[in-house]
């Protein structure tokens, strides 16, 4: 049994994702595909445009055999934590032979070399990093310049400018850190950059697709997503279950901030950023403006989004300190082929497999992380136009194809 692991968000699944999946299967020659996928909230620090079950359905229709949820505490964290949680989860299945990820670089050796330095932190790198931080540079910029200095490779600066390269490096770092036997592969990304806002070419970015849906409606993206994605999105929107955006939670987040809800224990809050956020919350009535008022060279838009989302979802620093990766396997969906690999996982894994949510307390020794997932769904459904009920995790069926 040859099994390929992929780490995805499919927010939503578009032509570029389909290309990555098909090329990954060709390159690795694997029989089975297991996807670890973000749930209802994603790594950008935002809600997914439609819920995790609809996106799991997209994954299965694209050719994935088994979809497993990445816990929300990892799915909404930094690139490093996101990658570590996802890789640790794939490794814990005990059936994954390969992992394939997209990157703008397309050069596994170069990405691996960077990952080695970041993981091992040799003395010359640490000195350069400390020196750069002392100059008041952001951590990302200080790290970039330190890597250039110790390698003598100026092109590393360009490599670290794109999100898929950064995630790829973090995947490799995580594999090395846990001494995984999973073999990595990378597929060179085609089409628009992840952050591109323009709908153009055969492969538009997920960011531009979400923006087009928000501004022009679903029909505007029909050439950039597979037919099955379009149909799933149309069905969801017709039923009042999407599209969901961060601004849909503006009243709740602003209520928490204006009522003085403490921020100091929220992950990634430091250096007085909480005071800046409180001040901005008193000057606006929506999240978009709050982020504009708060962001700066030091406090990026991404960081502010993550802080606000963690406030909304009650994710604090303690969860990261007390857990070393996901401690359960939550199944969102599987195909006929997926049944076979799920049986194999059941034989080999040491983690509890959750297929019936009502049984989670008897299966998971420390259920705090899982309970964040349940709470995240309850919060997410507040943005629905219809059927905005709680406890959806308890009765929504697993997606089967």
Swiss-Prot record:
Protein EC: 6.3.4.-
Identification of the protein by name: tRNA(Met) cytidine acetate ligase
Record organism: Caldanaerobacter subterraneus subsp. tengcongensis (strain DSM 15242 / JCM 11007 / NBRC 100824 / MB4) (Thermoanaerobacter tengcongensis)
GO annotation terms (biological process): tRNA modification
Family that this chain belongs to: Belongs to the TmcAL family.
One of the record's GO cellular component terms: cytoplasm
PANTHER family per the UniProt record, alphabetical: TRNA(MET) CYTIDINE ACETATE LIGASE (PTHR37825:SF1)
Annotated binding of ATP, by residue: 7-20, 102, 164, 189
UniProt xrefs under Pfam families: HIGH_NTase1 (PF05636)
Keywords assigned: ATP-binding, Cytoplasm, Ligase, Nucleotide-binding, RNA-binding, tRNA processing, tRNA-binding
Domain of life: Bacteria
Catalytic activity, as annotated: cytidine(34) in elongator tRNA(Met) + acetate + ATP = N(4)-acetylcytidine(34) in elongator tRNA(Met) + AMP + diphosphate
Gene Ontology MF, one: ligase activity, forming carbon-nitrogen bonds
Presence of the UniProt keyword Nucleotide-binding in the record: yes
Record HAMAP family: TmcAL (MF_01539)
Localization annotation: Cytoplasm
Annotated InterPro entries: Rossmann-like_a/b/a_fold, tRNA(Met)_cyd_acetate_ligase
Function, in words: Catalyzes the formation of N(4)-acetylcytidine (ac(4)C) at the wobble position of elongator tRNA(Met), using acetate and ATP as substrates. First activates an acetate ion to form acetyladenylate (Ac-AMP) and then transfers the acetyl group to tRNA to form ac(4)C34.
Coiled-coil spans in chain: none
Name of the gene: tmcAL
């Amino acid at each position: 049994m040859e099994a390929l692991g992929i780490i995805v968000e499919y927010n939503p699944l578009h032509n570029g994702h389909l290309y990555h999946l098909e090329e990954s299967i060709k390159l690795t020659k694997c029989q089975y595909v297991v996807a670890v996928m973000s749930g209802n909230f994603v790594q950008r620090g935002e809600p997914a445009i439609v819920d995790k079950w609809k996106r799991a359905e997209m994954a299965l229709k694209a050719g994935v055999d088994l979809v497993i949820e990445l816990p929300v505490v990892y799915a909404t964290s930094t690139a490093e934590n996101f990658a570590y949680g996802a890789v640790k989860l794939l490794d814990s299945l005990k059936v994954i032979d390969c992992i394939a990820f997209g990157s703008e670089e397309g050069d596994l050796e170069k990405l691996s070399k960077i990952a080695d330095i970041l993981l091992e932190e040799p003395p010359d790198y640490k000195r350069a990093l400390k020196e750069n931080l002392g100059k008041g540079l952001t951590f990302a910029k200080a790290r970039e310049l330190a890597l250039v200095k110790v390698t003598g490779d100026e092109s590393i600066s360009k490599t670290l400018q794109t999100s898929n390269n950064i995630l790829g490096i973090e995947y490799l770092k995580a594999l090395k850190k846990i001494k995984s036997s999973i073999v990595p592969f990378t597929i060179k990304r085609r089409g628009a950059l992840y952050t591109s806002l323009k709908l153009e070419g055969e492969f538009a970015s997920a960011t531009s697709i979400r923006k087009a849906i928000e501004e022009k409606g679903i029909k505007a993206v029909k050439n950039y997503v597979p037919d099955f994605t379009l149909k799933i999105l149309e069905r969801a929107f017709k039923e009042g279950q999407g599209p969901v955006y961060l601004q849909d939670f503006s009243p709740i987040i602003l209520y928490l901030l204006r009522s003085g809800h403490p921020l100091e224990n929220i992950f990634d809050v430091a250096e007085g950023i909480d005071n800046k956020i409180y001040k901005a919350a008193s000057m606006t009535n929506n999240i978009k403006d709050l982020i504009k008022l708060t962001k700066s060279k030091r406090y990026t838009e991404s960081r502010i989004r993550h802080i606000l989302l963690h406030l909304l979802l009650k994710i604090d620093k303690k969860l990261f300190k007390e857990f070393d990766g996901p401690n359960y396997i939550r199944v969102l969906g599987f195909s006929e082929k997926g049944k076979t690999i799920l049986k194999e996982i059941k034989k080999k894994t040491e983690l509890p497999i959750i297929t019936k949510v009502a049984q989670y307390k008897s299966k998971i020794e420390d259920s705090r992380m899982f309970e964040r997932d349940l709470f995240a769904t309850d919060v997410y459904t507040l943005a629905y136009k219809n059927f905005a009920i709680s406890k959806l995790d308890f009765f929504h069926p697993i997606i089967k194809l």
